[in-house]
Amino acid sequence: MNSPEIAPNFTHPDRNLAMELVRATEAAAIRAVPFIGRGDKNAADKAAVDAMRVFLGTVNFDGVIVIGEGEKDKAPMLFNGEHVGNGTGPACDIAVDPIDGTSLTAEGRQNALSVIAVSSRGTMLDASSVFYMDKIVTGAAGFGVVHLDQPIGDNLRALSQATGKPIGEMVVAVLNRPRHEGLIDAIRSAGAGTRLMSDGDVAGGINAARYGTRIDMCVGIGGSPEGITTACALKALGGFMQGRLAPKDDAERARAIAAGLDVDKVLDLDDMVSGDNTFVVATGVTDGGLVDGVRRKGPIIRTESIVMRGKSGTVRRVVADHLAAKWL
């Protein structure tokens, strides 16, 4: 039986990279566990950052962090522009979020993840000068049907017609923020239900694009780093996404323009990450709709991760048992 025509492009170093990245997110998630429900989000974040940094330093790639923990003078590790990896292997852009949902972790709530997104060097949008992004995410049915500039009611009706799913059965994920009060009212007035997220909009965006979930759409203003990470994931999921940078004030707008960003442009997937040579890995810190959180089972620590590869359009789940004595 002949191999698929695209198979020769799947190089072994690229395939192996996925498992190396999983080890980094697993380590970050495990190290955050002692801080779940303890009320100290900064301590949880530091533990995850420290663990991820160590593991990334051993990976066979030449990585540059495009989206990290902060500017070089504000974050000692995993800062924007930092080089990670051992310098061999593919040259990559990297987005890291050692904990997407530090508040969720500190409060012991669901949907906290440790996330890494990787793409070929020079393909990932550097949106670090603007903290927020307005976005809309759906499954593949959204292409040519919904648009960021359309009213939410029009988008819901269009997606309902495209999918054959009644609006009354549709669910829209939105961050539960005061800025979204009008948006939430409009969604409900159109007849759809809402899934209000306190944090962690990477999981919300991914679930909106995945087949067979309860989420049909994810909308609203969230973090621009989370937006770029979600875009990388959608390269594997085949979903639809648009975004627009949302500067919080005139100073941030000026900073974005100085960085060469068009803050008024509606960004398509290829504007956020070009090409399909992407990986996204996410390990659960706390339980959620995407993956289970870290669990202690006697002498074993169990982690669950999801691995999404854009080039092959493949989504895998990795369940790993770690000997607790090696970690605690």
Stretch-by-stretch model annotation:
Residues 2-95, 157, 161, 202-203, ...:
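N-terminal subdomain of lithium-sensitive/metallo-dependent phosphomonoesterases centered on the IMPase/IPPase/PAP
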Residues 15-18, 39, 103, 142-144, ...:
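A short glycine/serine-rich beta->alpha loop
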Residues 16, 136-154, 169:
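Glycine-rich phosphate-binding "P-loop"
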Residues 84-85, 114-117, 214-218:
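Short basic, glycine-rich beta-strand/loop surfaces that mediate nucleic-acid
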Residues 89-100, 104-125:
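DPxDG-like acidic metal-binding loop motif
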Residues 115-116, 138, 326-328:
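A short, polar/proline- and glycine-enriched secondary-structure boundary/capping micro-motif
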Residues 119-147:
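Flexible glycine-/small-residue-enriched beta->alpha junction loops
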Residues 150-309, 318-319:
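An extended, acidic
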